[in-house]
Amino acid sequence: MNFKYIKNIAPAAALLLAAGLSSCTGDLDVTPIDPGTVMVPDEPALYTKCYANMVLAGQTGKDGDCDIDGLDGGTTGFVRQLFNSQELGTDESICAWGDPGIPDFNYNQTTASHPMLTGFYYRLYAGINYCNHYLDVCNGVDPTRTAEVRFLRCLYYYYLMDAFGNVPFTTALASSNAHQIARADLFNWIEAELLGKTITINAMDDPSVVLAETSAEGALAQMQSPVARTSKDQGYGRADQDAANLLLARMYINAEVYTGTARWNDAKEYAEKVINGPHKLWTTGKGKWTAYQMLFMGDNGESGASQEAILPLINDGKTTTAYGCTYFLISSQWKADMEVDATDASCGDPWSGNRIRGAFLTKFFPNGDAPQVTISEMAAAAGDDRALFHGKDRELVITKPTEFTSGYSVGKFRSSKSDGSAQNDPKVPDTDFFLMRSAEAYLIAAEADARLNGGITTATGTGYLNQLRARANTSSMNQFSLNQVLDERARELYCEGFRRSDLVRFGYYGGAKSSEYLWEWKGGAETGVGFSETKNIFALPFDDINVNKNLKQNPGY
């Protein structure tokens, strides 16, 4: 990767000098000016940074001292660009803004020079570099925290594998250009790193170069045992063994895409490890708020809803502020006219950008007749608590992509709290983002069940999906076809960073079946048009291709 875009490889908080002074440098090999100075790694700060990269822009405030050059801090946010790369350009979301890169996302026209994908790419590599630095200087300080950092490095690499395919690979900080790893080999490395399998992986660009030899104990076995926590409990926000189990289940359900070989049995096995663990579905509503709504509210870390959270990204309007996490998910989808009632401060800073495409609303209204009503009225009309859309004074089908009212609005994420208390800051939400939650395991297990049984769920898979439907106060079904499983994933997980990967796995994004499922503005055409399977992954950023001659660009770019 091109390190010039990643600042603070050794952040100020990460190295404490014996004299009591801090050091901040972009150099990869840090040597004290005074040979007598002893450099002591600040293990807690480095450990925290490995997690914080998924929420914060940099070292200070919402945009302050961003770790990624070239874009403002909020735009480089991990969750913000996960949303853009997974939801924009699918049947789910479209954005009204004209910021460089947004129209390209909307119309599936991204290139190697796409600024936001470049920011996402370097945000992920920043996380990998922090993890590599921790494992270099703090390995052995705390075996459990070391295992967590190994897991986080796997997670960052997973998102790179999914979005960009064959990517640069390194497990250590180095000034030389990284070699390229094949997508299937990266899959195998992540699996081995988590489970402790013995493998040898060679560089894609030079097979004589050994990139990794994994034989150590897997990270999963050394991580914390699964425990459901609230924000009041010590360890809230840390990854436990169920995070590794769910990452493996997520990889296995997509294994045919990533490696060419299906792993349905493994997907079901690891998903059921999560289902049978302590991270249970949250099923208890509070007052006017449903159980499903409470997963995405300002007190989701305190209300009990976090029992479902396997990896919550912590947001706090007072001490942890960022434009690129739940602030973005809420503000970008809200307009002031969406308030449910005068006492509901759902969004303190509406930006009026992202909304839902008409094709997606057919998941809740199959006849294409979603009413022009408020959020609470919409859920009642759909007979499904998950239909959190605002249609009043909106157009059902998007005819004017740059106008926010052309298309229904999404009211899934909120600043308001289920107990009615005020947020810490009137604009900055306290809403945590559940990057991993146990509902995903139910969906993976059901899909694997159907794929193992001729495309129809057995009683086991049907039961998993009906538990989600029961939580949403909608009717149960006798069985589910694969397309119905896909629709159930859409209803449960929309706007949480999954849709492009799901459509790719089912063949409806790019490729031979792309024209079988069209949505408005797919491929840039108002009524939709199919496109090549080369669009199923994004281009490696031009900046990296230009400086690292080890890299080969993805086909079609």
For the regions a protein language model found, what residue spans apply to each?
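Long, intrinsically disordered, low-complexity segments
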Residues: 24-25, 43, 92, 124-125, ...
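Flexible, polar/acidic helix-loop-strand segments at domain edges
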Residues: 99-109, 119, 359-437
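Short coil/turn linking the two alpha-helices of tandem helical-hairpin repeats
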Residues: 159-168, 254-260, 453-454
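Conserved, well-structured interaction surfaces
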Residues: 44, 48, 52, 57-58, ...
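Membrane-proximal, proline-rich intrinsically disordered regions
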Residues: 24-78, 548-557
